[in-house]
């Protein structure tokens, strides 16, 4: 059996980063983690395009348009949806998750779900780099590996 693994090198990769303005104090940290991970793994800043959208519900549409251009090896989606007192959280978080998954499956371009879905602001901040690592950086690493694996499959 042949085992095929991808590298975590972003030298020749071009990524689109889609982030939300909503909950920007949290999302800005995710973006910083994503940019740092991309550069630390050999990516060039000019190969990382950053697109801002109002909120997490708008992320899938922009991610899909970017994936369909064929200009990007992967799209990284970052946002934060924090539970409140109404059902709004369920619709936004579910819509974002389903839309991002469908974008990846429809286009064949890897699309990372880096949208935090938490009960509290504290949980979100912890996942944005304060205590539990930076989920923005983790999303980029997953896309570097996935994009490189797809390149190997296509050879």
UniProtKB/Swiss-Prot annotation:
Record-annotated residues binding (2S)-2-hydroxy-3-oxobutyl phosphate? 85-86, 127
Any GO molecular function: 6,7-dimethyl-8-ribityllumazine synthase activity
Q: In which pathway does it act?
A: Cofactor biosynthesis; riboflavin biosynthesis; riboflavin from 2-hydroxy-3-oxobutyl phosphate and 5-amino-6-(D-ribitylamino)uracil: step 1/2
Instruction: Provide the alphabetized UniProt keywords.
Output: Riboflavin biosynthesis, Transferase
- Enumerate the transmembrane spans: none
Q: Which reaction does it catalyse?
A: (2S)-2-hydroxy-3-oxobutyl phosphate + 5-amino-6-(D-ribitylamino)uracil = 6,7-dimethyl-8-(1-D-ribityl)lumazine + phosphate + 2 H2O + H(+)
So what EC number does this one have? 2.5.1.78
**In its UniProt record, which GO terms are filed under biological process?**
riboflavin biosynthetic process
A GO CC term attached to the entry: riboflavin synthase complex
InterPro entries xref list: LS, LS/RS, LS/RS_sf
Task: Cite the CDD domains for this sequence.
Answer: Lumazine_synthase-I (cd09209)
Q: Does the keyword Transferase apply?
A: yes
Q: Where, by residue number, does 5-amino-6-(D-ribitylamino)uracil bind?
A: 22, 56-58, 80-82, 113
Q: Which residues constitute the catalytic centre?
A: 88 (proton donor)
Which enzyme class, named as a word?
A: transferase
**Transferase in keyword set:** yes
Instruction: Give the protein family.
Output: Belongs to the DMRL synthase family.
Role noted for this protein: Catalyzes the formation of 6,7-dimethyl-8-ribityllumazine by condensation of 5-amino-6-(D-ribitylamino)uracil with 3,4-dihydroxy-2-butanone 4-phosphate. This is the penultimate step in the biosynthesis of riboflavin.
What is the name attached to this protein's record? 6,7-dimethyl-8-ribityllumazine synthase
Q: Which organism is it from?
A: Deinococcus radiodurans (strain ATCC 13939 / DSM 20539 / JCM 16871 / CCUG 27074 / LMG 4051 / NBRC 15346 / NCIMB 9279 / VKM B-1422 / R1)
What's the encoding gene here?
ribH
């Amino acid at each position: 059996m042949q085992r095929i693994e991808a590298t975590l090198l972003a030298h020749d990769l071009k990524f689109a980063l889609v982030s939300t303005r909503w909950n920007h104090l949290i999302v800005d940290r995710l973006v910083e983690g994503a940019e740092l991970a991309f550069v630390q793994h050999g990516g060039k800043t000019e190969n990382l395009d950053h697109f801002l959208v109002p909120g997490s519900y708008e992320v899938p549409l922009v991610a899909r348009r970017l994936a369909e251009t064929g200009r990007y090896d992967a799209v990284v989606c970052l946002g934060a949806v924090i539970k409140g007192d109404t059902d709004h959280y369920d619709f936004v978080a579910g819509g974002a998750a389903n839309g991002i998954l469908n974008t990846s499956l429809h286009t064949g371009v890897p699309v990372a779900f880096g949208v935090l879905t938490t009960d509290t602001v504290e949980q979100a901040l912890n996942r944005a780099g304060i205590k539990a690592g930076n989920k923005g950086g983790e999303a980029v690493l997953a896309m570097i590996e996935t994009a490189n694996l797809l390149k190997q499959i296509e050879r």
